[in-house]
From Swiss-Prot:
PANTHER family (alphabetical): LIPID PHOSPHATE PHOSPHATASE, PHOSPHOLIPID PHOSPHATASE-RELATED PROTEIN TYPE 2
Protein name in the entry: Phospholipid phosphatase-related protein type 2
Cellular compartments per GO CC: plasma membrane
Region forming the signal peptide: none
Sites of Phosphoserine modification: 299, 312
Length: 343
């Protein structure tokens, strides 16, 4: 920005790239997430279990909607929370800009596309950050669902919904001589319970709810830390970030306390979501900072007098005028002396 006027940049590829590239990629990610979540296009791996295994014999906690952290609440939080935070942050940044001395050079340009479309820096930042967040949210869903489909790890209440016939499977009941399980069941028809409940009970690792919460919290906390400017206090931003981390931690605790997931499932979900958010913030949106403007090429019809000039190295480092060096390397004074003539 020079003289109070924003830097303008003309681009005819921003709208086609957004419509035909980024929107298409986002649609593919959404479609794949839907296929993994709500269809049987990718069947869940059938993993065996030990007879009377206490790790999978917890009571059935009921449907997911009856949980203290139901999926509807989690989806609403991971969608509305980061969106409102980023929206408020960008509005505050646009209407109350920081002084140049306390913030890096923005370098954002107002992009003009065609004769009518003009994209200001606040609008571009808002679309960029929310678009990348949406892409990462569905990517996290894909990673979590793919892990559940491939591994097929049972939940802690798996045997309660499976209801296997141990007598028909040849599983003797535990006794003092055999305190632990001694037979591993791999028969796919061993479960007599509801097929839908059994299929849902085979999708424990990693915990999808924990992954989504960790992704949303990490992305939002990094935005608060890197974008928000608070003067006179060092505890405001850490307090906000810890307040954001608390619900995600509580979701993991609820999943374990209700026997819906193991601790290992929750931890794997936390790591998956946090890793995806960290990658997107660091490598895609560049820590929510704008790249400095690096200049542009002059068009052929522009005046060459506007081109940047370069100083000559001879002007920067002039040769000393006091002494010169002989061609054989012996120095001698630069002032010429007239030889004496014998008379």
């Amino acid at each position: 920005m020079a003289g109070g006027r924003p830097h303008l940049k003309r681009s005819f590829s921003i709208i086609p790239c957004f419509v035909f590239v980024e929107s298409v990629l986002l649609g593919i990610v959404v479609l794949l997430a839907y296929r993994l979540e709500f269809t049987d296009t990718f069947p869940v791996h059938t993993q065996g279990f030990f007879c009377y295994d206490s790790a999978y014999a917890k009571p059935y906690p009921g449907p997911e909607a009856a949980s203290r952290a139901p999926p509807a609440l989690i989806y609403a939080l991971v969608t509305a929370g980061p969106t409102l935070t980023i929206l408020l942050g960008e509005l505050a940044r646009a209407f109350f800009p920081a002084p140049p001395s306390s913030s890096p050079v923005s370098g954002e340009s107002t992009i003009v596309s065609g004769a009518c479309c003009r994209f200001s820096p606040p609008l571009r930042r808002l679309v960029r950050f929310l678009g990348v967040y949406s892409f990462g949210l569905f990517t996290t869903t894909i990673f979590a669902n793919a892990g559940q489909v491939v591994t097929g790890n049972p939940t802690p209440h798996f045997l309660s919904v499976c209801r296997p016939n141990y007598t028909a499977l040849g599983c003797p009941p535990p006794s003092p001589d055999r305190p632990g399980p001694d037979r591993f069941v791999t028969d796919q028809s061993a479960c007599a319970g509801s097929p839908s409940l059994v299929a849902a009970a085979r999708r424990a690792f990693p915990c999808k709810d924990a992954a989504l919460c960790a992704y949303a919290v990490t992305y939002t906390a990094m935005y608060v830390t890197l974008v928000f400017r608070v003067k006179g206090s060092r505890l405001v931003k850490p307090s906000l970030c810890l307040a954001l981390l608390c619900p995600a931690f509580l979701v993991g605790v609820v999943r374990v306390a209700e026997y819906r997931n193991h601790w290992s499932d929750v931890l794997a979900g936390f790591l998956t979501g946090a890793a995806i958010a960290t990658f997107l913030v660091t490598c895609v949106v560049h820590n929510f900072q704008s790249r400095p403007h690096s200049g542009r090429r002059l068009s052929p019809w522009e005046d060459l007098s506007q081109a940047p000039t370069m100083d000559s190295p001879l002007e920067k480092n002039p040769r000393p005028a006091g002494r010169i060096r002989h061609r054989h390397g012996s120095p001698h004074p630069s002032r010429r002396t007239v030889p004496a003539v014998a008379t």
